[in-house]
C-alpha cells in the first residue's frame, strides 16, 4: 500500500520520488539537531543513487525544479486561504464592535434608567445604512412640516410660566420643565448648572420723574414708572431737559444746545439702552430718560411701561471676567461698563407731558411725533430719582446634548433665552419653542432616522438674558478653558420671528459661505422664493448688538456665532413691554407657524451641515477680505504714519502671511486623504483656531472682556485704531501718538499670531516677519 501511495504522489508531482526524514518532535525543537538529521537523510539518498549506479541499473535522475513549483503553488494557495479567513473574521468583529459603539443617542440614557436591551432593540426601527445630505434635508423638512410651533409658543406663555423674570419661581419652573423635556426626548444627557448673580431691581422707594419750577419752586409729579432700567445708578438729579433724538454719538454731536450738566431724553430704538446712556455720559449729561415714540413704535396704548438695562457689556457686572459660581470668592469689583448717571424709562404719555413744558420743534429729519420738543424753558427743570437696588439671585442654565459619533468632543451650541421681564412671547418664547422642537426632531432623526452626526449638538436654555446675556456669559466665563477648540459654533435662536418681510443675519465671516448655502436651500414660507435674493447680502450683514447672546460667544470667547431673524423694516414694538403676549405676536405675524418652521429649517440645516461633513464648514478665507479692507483703510493715512517715523511694512507682511497660511491650509485639505481621521481632525483643529486667535492676547479679559480685534470693544480693536488715527487730522491735540504706536504694533502681532496658528505646527510656519 505504501509503495502504491508513493507511486501515485510521484506521478502527481512529475514522476519525482519523494524522500522524507525520520526524526522525533522532541529533537526538532532543539534546532541544530534537525539540520543534522536532514543532512543525513540527503546523504542516505545519495548513497542509494551511487549503489544503483554501481549495480549498472539505468535510472533517470528526477527533475526537482518541477517539484519546487508545485510546492510553491500549494503554499501560496494555503497562505491566501488563511489570510482570507483572518481578514473575514476580523471584519466581522469590527462590524459587531461598531454596531455596539454606534448606538442611537438615547440608548445611553435608556440603559442608565434600567431599560432592558431587548426593549431598546425593539423600540428603534432599522435605519438606512448611510444617509446623503439630500436625505437629511428631506427628512428635516418632512418632520418640520408636521410640527405645530404655535402650540408650543402658546404653552410657554400660559400663566404658569409668565411673567418669568430671571431668578423667579416661574423662571425656575420653566427651567426644570425644559430639562425634563430633554430627558423625555432621550438625548444623550440632560443637565443644568446654577449661578448666583447680582441684578438690579426696583427698590421699596419708587422711581419718579417730576417737573420743578426754577423760580416758584413748584413741583409737579409726572410719573412713578412701573418699568425701569437695570444697572442704572441709584441717584437723584435735577437739571434742564434736552432732546437728543436716538442718543447716538452723531445725534449728540449735531445738537445745537450743549448737554453738559443737563438731563437728556432720547427715543428707544436704533442702538441699545446701554449705548445711549454711555454716549450721554461721554457728553457730560447728568441723567437719561428713554421713551417709545409713536412714529417708530405705533402702539395705541400710550401708558405702556417697558424695561431694559444700562450695562455696556454682558454677564454679571459685579464679577467681570469671572464666573458667578456660589463657591467663588472674588474681591469686590465691578464692570467698567456700568453707568455713573441715573437712567429711567417713561411712557409716551408722560414724555408728551414733559414736551408740554419744552420749547423748539424737533428737526423734520428725525421723523418723529409732532409733539416732540427740543429743550425745557428757563422756568422749568426736571428732577429724576432712581432708587433701584441690587439683588442676588440664583439662575439656572439648562443643557441637553446629542453626542457625536466620530468627534464627540467637538460640538455646536444652539441656544435661546428663557426669561423675560414681561410675558416675553416674541422675546423668549419663540426661541425656546424652536430650541425644544429642534431637539425633538434631531433626536428623532438620530434614534429612528439613521442620522449619525460626526460632532455633538448641545442645546442650551439661558436665564437672565434680559439683564445682558448674563446666563450665557457666566457659562462662557466658567468653562472657557473647556470650550476652547471644542465649541466651534454658536447658533442663537432669540427673536428669530418678528415679522415676515425680511431675513436678516448677524454672523462671523467664517459662517458666511455656509449661511449662503442654507439660504439657497430654504424657501420663504410666504413668497415661496429662496431666502437668497441678493448676491451682495454679505455687505448687509449687521454687527452683533451688545444685547445679543451671540455677541459674547464671538467677542469674548472667539467662537464663531450666528443670529438671524425674520422681521420687518421697522422694530417689533412690543419687545421688553408688558404687551409682548402671544395674541399680539400672532396679530403681527399671522403666518407665525410657517415662519417658525422656516426659522427652524435654517437653524436645522446649519446644525446638520456643521456636524455632518468631515471638514468643518467654516470658511477661514473670508477673513482675508476683512484684513485687506482694514489695510486699505489704514493706508489712506500713510502720510500721517510716515510723519511719525512709522511705516506699514510689518502690517503688510502680517497680512501676506495670513493669506499664505489660508492658501496652504486649503491646499492641505484638497490633498488630504478623506478617510484618514487623524489628518482631517488636524485640519479641523487648525480651522477652529482662526476665530480664537483674533482675540487680542495683549489686553486683560477682566478689563477688556471683548478682546476680538474685529468685533470686540476697546482701544485694541481695528475700528478704535482707525478712529484714533482720524483724530490726528481732525483734532491733533486729542491724538495720542504713544497709544497709536501700541495699537499698530499689537494689531500687527495679533494678525501675525492668527496666521501662525493657522499654519499648524511650528515647523510648518514659514514667514520672514
Swiss-Prot record:
The keyword Transmembrane applies. The modification Phosphothreonine is found at residue 21. Residues 92-769 are extracellular. The YTRF endocytosis motif engages the clathrin-mediated endocytic machinery through adapter protein-2. The lineage of its organism: Eukaryota, Metazoa, Chordata, Craniata, Vertebrata. Keywords: Cell membrane, Disulfide bond, Endocytosis, Glycoprotein, Host-virus interaction, Lipoprotein, Membrane, Palmitate, Phosphoprotein, Receptor, Signal-anchor, Transmembrane, Transmembrane helix. This is Transferrin receptor protein 1. PANTHER family: N-ACETYLATED-ALPHA-LINKED ACIDIC DIPEPTIDASE, TRANSFERRIN RECEPTOR PROTEIN 1. It is a single-pass type II membrane protein. Homodimer; disulfide-linked. Binds one transferrin molecule per subunit. Interacts with SH3BP4. Homodimer; disulfide-linked. Binds one transferrin or HFE molecule per subunit. Binds the HLA class II histocompatibility antigen, DR1. Interacts with SH3BP3. Interacts with STEAP3; facilitates TFRC endocytosis in erythroid precursor cells. Cellular uptake of iron occurs via receptor-mediated endocytosis of ligand-occupied transferrin receptor into specialized endosomes. Endosomal acidification leads to iron release. The apotransferrin-receptor complex is then recycled to the cell surface with a return to neutral pH and the concomitant loss of affinity of apotransferrin for its receptor. Transferrin receptor is necessary for development of erythrocytes and the nervous system. Positively regulates T and B cell proliferation through iron uptake. GO terms for molecular function: transferrin receptor activity.
Amino acid at each position: 500500500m505504501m509503495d502504491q501511495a508513493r507511486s501515485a504522489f510521484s506521478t502527481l508531482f512529475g514522476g519525482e520520488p519523494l524522500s522524507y526524514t525520520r526524526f522525533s518532535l522532541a529533537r526538532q525543537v532543539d534546532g541544530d539537531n534537525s539540520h543534522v538529521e536532514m543532512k543525513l537523510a540527503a546523504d542516505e539518498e545519495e548513497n542509494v543513487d551511487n549503489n544503483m549506479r554501481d549495480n549498472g541499473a539505468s535510472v533517470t535522475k528526477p527533475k526537482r525544479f518541477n517539484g519546487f513549483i508545485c510546492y510553491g503553488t500549494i503554499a501560496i494557495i494555503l497562505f491566501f486561504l488563511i489570510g482570507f479567513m483572518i481578514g473575514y473574521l476580523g471584519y466581522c468583529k469590527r462590524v459587531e464592535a461598531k454596531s455596539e459603539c454606534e448606538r442611537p443617542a438615547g440608548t445611553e440614557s435608556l440603559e442608565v434608567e434600567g431599560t432592558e436591551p431587548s426593549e431598546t432593540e425593539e423600540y428603534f426601527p432599522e435605519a438606512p445604512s448611510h444617509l446623503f445630505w439630500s436625505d437629511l434635508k428631506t427628512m428635516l423638512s418632512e418632520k418640520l412640516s408636521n410640527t405645530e410651533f404655535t402650540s408650543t409658543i402658546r404653552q410657554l406663555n400660559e400663566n404658569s410660566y409668565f411673567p418669568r423674570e430671571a431668578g423667579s419661581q416661574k423662571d425656575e419652573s420653566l427651567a426644570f420643565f425644559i430639562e425634563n423635556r430633554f430627558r423625555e426626548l432621550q438625548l444623550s444627557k440632560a443637565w443644568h448648572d446654577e449661578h448666583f448673580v447680582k441684578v438690579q431691581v426696583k427698590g421699596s422707594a419708587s422711581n419718579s420723574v417730576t417737573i420743578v419750577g426754577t423760580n416758584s419752586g413748584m413741583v409737579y409729579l409726572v410719573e412713578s414708572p412701573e418699568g425701569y432700567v437695570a444697572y442704572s445708578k441709584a441717584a437723584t438729579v435735577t437739571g434742564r431737559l434736552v432732546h437728543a433724538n436716538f442718543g447716538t454719538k452723531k445725534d449728540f454731536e449735531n445738537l445745537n444746545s450743549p448737554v453738559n450738566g443737563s438731563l437728556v431724553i432720547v427715543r428707544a430704538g436704533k442702538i441699545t439702552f446701554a449705548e445711549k446712556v454711555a454716549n450721554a455720559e461721554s457728553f457730560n449729561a447728568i441723567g437719561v430718560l428713554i421713551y417709545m415714540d409713536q412714529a417708530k413704535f405705533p402702539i395705541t396704548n400710550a401708558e405702556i411701561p417697558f424695561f431694559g438695562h444700562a450695562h455696556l457689556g454682558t454677564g454679571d457686572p459685579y464679577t467681570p471676567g469671572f464666573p458667578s459660581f456660589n463657591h467663588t470668592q472674588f474681591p469686590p469689583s465691578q464692570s467698567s461698563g456700568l453707568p455713573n448717571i441715573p437712567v429711567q424709562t417713561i411712557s409716551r404719555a408722560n414724555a408728551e407731558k414733559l414736551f408740554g413744558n419744552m420749547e423748539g420743534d424737533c428737526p423734520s429729519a428725525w421723523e418723529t411725533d409732532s409733539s416732540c420738543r427740543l429743550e425745557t424753558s428757563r422756568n422749568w427743570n426736571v428732577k429724576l430719582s432712581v432708587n433701584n437696588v441690587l439683588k442676588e439671585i440664583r439662575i439656572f442654565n439648562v443643557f441637553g446634548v446629542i453626542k457625536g459619533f466620530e468627534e464627540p468632543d467637538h460640538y455646536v451650541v444652539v441656544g435661546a433665552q428663557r426669561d423675560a421681564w414681561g410675558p416675553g412671547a416674541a422675546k423668549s418664547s419663540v426661541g425656546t419653542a424652536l430650541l425644544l422642537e429642534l431637539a425633538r426632531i434631531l433626536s428623532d432623526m438620530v434614534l429612528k432616522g439613521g442620522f449619525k452626526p460626526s460632532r455633538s449638538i448641545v442645546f442650551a436654555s439661558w436665564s437672565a438674558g434680559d439683564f445682558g446675556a448674563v446666563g450665557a456669559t457666566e457659562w462662557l466665563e466658567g468653562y472657557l478653558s473647556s470650550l476652547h477648540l471644542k465649541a466651534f459654533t454658536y447658533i442663537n435662536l432669540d427673536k428669530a420671528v418678528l415679522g415676515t418681510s425680511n431675513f436678516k443675519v448677524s454672523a462671523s465671516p467664517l459662517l458666511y459661505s455656509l449661511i449662503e448655502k442654507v439660504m439657497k436651500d430654504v424657501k420663504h414660507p410666504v413668497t415661496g422664493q429662496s431666502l437668497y435674493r441678493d448676491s451682495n447680502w454679505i455687505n448687509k450683514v449687521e454687527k452683533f448688538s451688545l444685547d445679543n447672546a451671540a455677541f459674547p460667544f464671538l467677542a469674548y470667547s472667539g467662537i464663531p456665532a450666528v443670529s438671524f431673524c425674520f422681521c420687518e423694516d421697522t422694530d417689533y414694538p412690543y419687545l421688553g413691554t408688558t404687551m409682548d403676549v402671544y395674541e399680539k405676536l400672532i396679530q403681527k405675524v399671522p403666518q407665525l407657524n410657517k415662519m417658525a418652521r422656516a426659522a427652524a429649517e435654517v437653524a436645522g440645516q446649519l446644525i446638520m451641515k456643521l456636524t455632518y461633513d468631515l471638514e468643518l464648514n467654516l470658511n477661514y478665507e473670508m477673513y482675508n477680505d476683512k484684513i485687506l479692507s482694514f489695510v486699505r483703510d489704514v493706508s489712506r493715512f500713510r502720510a500721517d504714519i510716515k510723519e511719525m517715523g512709522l511705516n506699514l511694512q510689518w502690517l503688510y507682511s502680517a497680512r501676506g502671511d495670513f493669506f499664505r497660511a489660508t492658501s496652504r491650509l486649503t491646499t492641505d485639505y484638497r490633498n488630504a486623504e478623506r478617510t484618514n481621521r487623524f489628518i482631517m481632525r488636524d485640519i479641523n483643529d487648525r480651522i477652529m483656531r482662526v476665530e480664537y486667535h483674533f482675540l487680542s492676547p495683549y489686553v486683560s479679559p477682566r478689563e477688556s472682556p471683548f478682546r476680538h480685534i474685529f468685533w470686540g470693544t476697546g482701544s485694541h480693536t481695528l475700528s478704535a485704531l482707525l478712529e484714533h488715527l482720524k483724530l490726528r487730522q481732525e483734532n491733533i491735540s486729542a491724538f495720542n501718538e504713544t497709544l497709536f504706536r501700541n495699537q499698530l504694533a499689537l494689531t500687527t502681532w495679533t494678525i501675525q499670531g492668527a496666521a501662525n496658528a493657522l499654519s499648524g505646527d511650528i515647523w510648518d510656519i514659514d514667514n520672514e516677519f
